[in-house]
């Protein structure tokens, strides 16, 4: 009698969480597609909920992505970098979006090449490459939302992206809501069921398990870098309105 082994069903391994470089690459393409759809509209209008125009918000976004790469390269212990790269103020919006792609690619390449043990200063928590990737993804998601909402282009940050950002940068975020709605609430952009819209906010970029650092360098507020920063725009250094 030939015995056949009983079939066994293997338990599938849990799916690996997406890598931050993959999330940043996807966020870049998603944001650029939405912004390109709005390229022919009036970018002199104020971005949703911000004091900046849509054009100035785009400049802030490119500056922030470049700055995150610079922080990981220079690795300062107590200050922001001294290089600030912004978009040509005379350039057309489609050309500015090319500049945004350059800034995002620069950030992505730097993050990919940075060893995991590296730390760099940020006013909202000294962080690692994954933390700066999460910040870059957040900047893309939030400011694409700000611009597209102001210009009437339907768009919302992807739920998977928002869930990853919340887990990395907002460990105390409320549960029981959609990730996108929760991220917008955490960053002062919308109310959440049972919770009023936040007036002030910040994320926590510190690496879990690292020893806390005390003190805030001179010239830095609790909500970002000096000299000016809107409380709802994120921590990249603000671009003064032209």
Residue ranges and their predicted role:
Residues 83-87:
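Short, charge-patterned binding micro-sites
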Residues 62-69:
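An amphipathic alpha-helix adjacent to DNA-recognition modules
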């Amino acid at each position: 009698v030939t015995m056949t082994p009983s079939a066994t069903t293997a338990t599938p391994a849990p799916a690996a969480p997406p890598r931050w470089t993959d999330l940043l690459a996807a966020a870049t393409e998603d944001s650029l597609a939405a912004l390109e759809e709005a390229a022919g509209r009036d970018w002199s209008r104020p971005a949703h909920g911000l004091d900046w125009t849509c054009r100035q918000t785009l400049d802030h976004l490119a500056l922030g992505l470049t700055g995150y790469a610079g922080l990981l390269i220079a690795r300062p212990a107590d200050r922001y970098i001294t290089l600030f790269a912004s978009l040509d103020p005379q350039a057309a919006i489609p050309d500015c979006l090319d500049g945004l792609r350059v800034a995002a690619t620069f950030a992505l390449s730097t993050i990919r090449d940075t060893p995991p043990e590296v730390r760099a200063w940020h006013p909202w928590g000294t962080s690692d490459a994954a933390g700066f990737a999460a910040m870059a993804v957040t900047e893309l998601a939030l400011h694409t939302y700000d611009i597209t909402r102001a210009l009437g282009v339907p768009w919302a940050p992807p739920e998977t992206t928002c869930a990853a950002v919340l887990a990395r940068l907002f460990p105390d975020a409320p549960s029981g809501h959609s990730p996108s709605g929760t991220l917008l609430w955490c960053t002062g952009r919308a109310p959440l069921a049972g919770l009023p819209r936040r007036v002030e906010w910040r994320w926590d970029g510190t690496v879990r398990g690292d020893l806390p650092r005390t003190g805030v360098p001179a010239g830095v507020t609790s909500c970002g870098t000096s000299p000016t920063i809107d409380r709802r725009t994120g921590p990249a250094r603000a671009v003064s309105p032209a």
